[in-house]
From Swiss-Prot:
Pfam families, A to Z: Methyltransf_5
E.C. code: 2.1.1.199
Catalytic activity field: cytidine(1402) in 16S rRNA + S-adenosyl-L-methionine = N(4)-methylcytidine(1402) in 16S rRNA + S-adenosyl-L-homocysteine + H(+)
Family that this chain belongs to: Belongs to the methyltransferase superfamily. RsmH family.
One MF annotation (Gene Ontology) recorded for this entry: rRNA (cytosine-N4-)-methyltransferase activity
Keyword line: Cytoplasm, Methyltransferase, rRNA processing, S-adenosyl-L-methionine, Transferase
Protein's name according to its UniProt entry: Ribosomal RNA small subunit methyltransferase H
Gene transcribed to yield this protein: rsmH
Localisation: Cytoplasm
Record GO biological process: rRNA base methylation
Role summary: Specifically methylates the N4 position of cytidine in position 1402 (C1402) of 16S rRNA.
Amino acid sequence: MSEQFQHVSVLLHESIDGLAIKPDGIYIDGTFGRGGHSRQILSQLGENGRLYSIDRDPQAIAEAKTITDPKFTIIHGPFSGLKQYVEELDLVGKIDGVLLDLGVSSPQLDDAERGFSFMKDGPLDMRMDPTSGIPVSQWLQEADVEDITWVIREFGEDKHAWRIAKGIVAYLENEENEPLTRTSQLAKLISEVAPKSFKEKKHPATRAFQAFRIYINSELDEIDTALKGALDVLAPEGRLSVISFHSLEDRMVKHFIRKESKGPQVPHGLPLTEEQIKALGSAKMKPVGKAIKPTKNEVNENVRSRSSVLRIAERL
């Protein structure tokens, strides 16, 4: 890995411990990133164990190809395709554990050319896979104020969404302005139009940048599909270990595990026979322990871990 863009895996040991690795098990790392979790899983596998890792970032794929362990296979694609990949491998119901480390990796944030960070000047892109989809700069050119407001409010949970969206559209409609193509331009613009608040510790552009990244990569849809796919491919007693980095992600994971742990909810008094109730199915998984957050030591060593949450569940 390039020394310039190092990545420290968050909740590394806790998430791997949550998988309860079997030496001869079959595992999926849905988010290879720079391989921290994958390498840890591989170190615990015996000769007959297998690890299939997934990533849609070409730089992550290049890093994965440096691993020569015959137990390891890298798959280039979004983790929402997890179920499809496992079906093609004819391993549905045979997977002993699935790990999902959500969010943006440190090398992606640190590489200005990827356009994820308002702290660094770079192209206003934000695509996880630069070979598909459109960059944020193009989307902003084509979107109206209502669309931009909705994205910032829905995915950034920013109460100033309307004001920020109006400022962006006003800038773009002024022909005297330079094209909005750089992260530094957008960060400066948001800082100028967002109301000044002494209570807000974060940079004014934090939530909007998060919102645009989530939207342009369809991240929440990807997570929803991946969670459902993981449930479908896991073997009985197989583990699901998910690390999230903001409240939108964590709520999705929490609600998914809760829903699948309860099974179908039958309204009280509904006239169903015992056979009909059984036909509705039962709980498909159970939570393992409580949500885990990083220790103070980990946060001190890696400040980006401070918002992370790990949730673990087991297939029934």
